Amino acid sequence: MDALIGDLQERIKASGLPVDLIVVSDHGMIAFKDRNFVALDKMVDLQGVPEVGDHLYPETEAEKEKIYEELKVKDDPRFAVYRLKDVPAQLHYDGNAREGDPVVEPLEAVPVTVHANSAETRSKGDHGWDPQLMPDMKAIFYAEGPDVKPGVKVGTFENVNLYDFVAGLLGLKVGKNDGDKKVLQPVRR
């Protein structure tokens, strides 16, 4: 990856164009600490419950509440369970129905799957954990170019703050979002 980015930097320089280059990841990765995965269908009856990936989409409010209560009572230290409306603000779910309900948040480096026979259980690692709980989930951020101050270092920040930064570099009007434009302001020339 380093060689590819280096090649891109050289090509940008050779072009003579005023290009700002931003290298960012949406998340980190973490190796599973063990194979003691959480299989939701071994904890609660999910027969007939629509799901996509590790998201559950019960069709009625009663089903959502029943699954939530059954998972909550397990009091398993490997995960937290929330109703969608109660997900902690730092996770930026904002009640979006695409997230499913209830929401299961891993608290340890173990896979959380809907089905015990999921391909996920054969994986060696994954992403999706809260970076405040698991530092390996933190993303990378590098920026350089004519609109970026060289040598400026910023601390860890949430990716929701990138929107204002990139829109500003492009001269675009910024819409309402969860980011804080002050976070990356020190990087701008």
Model-derived features: positions:
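A long, amphipathic alpha-helix that forms part
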Residues: 1-21, 66, 166
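Acidic active-site catalytic centers that drive phospho-/nucleotidyl reactions
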Residues: 2, 26, 161
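Surface-exposed helix-capping loop/turn segments at secondary-structure junctions
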Residues: 9-19, 77-82, 172-178
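Acidic/histidine-rich catalytic neighborhood
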Residues: 18-21, 25-59
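Short loop/turn and capping residues at structural boundaries
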Residues: 23, 35, 85, 177-180
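Active-site neighborhoods of enzymes that stabilize oxyanions during catalysis
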Residues: 51-153, 157-168
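…; additionally, a secondary subgroup of soluble metalloenzymes is captured
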Residues: 152, 161, 165-189
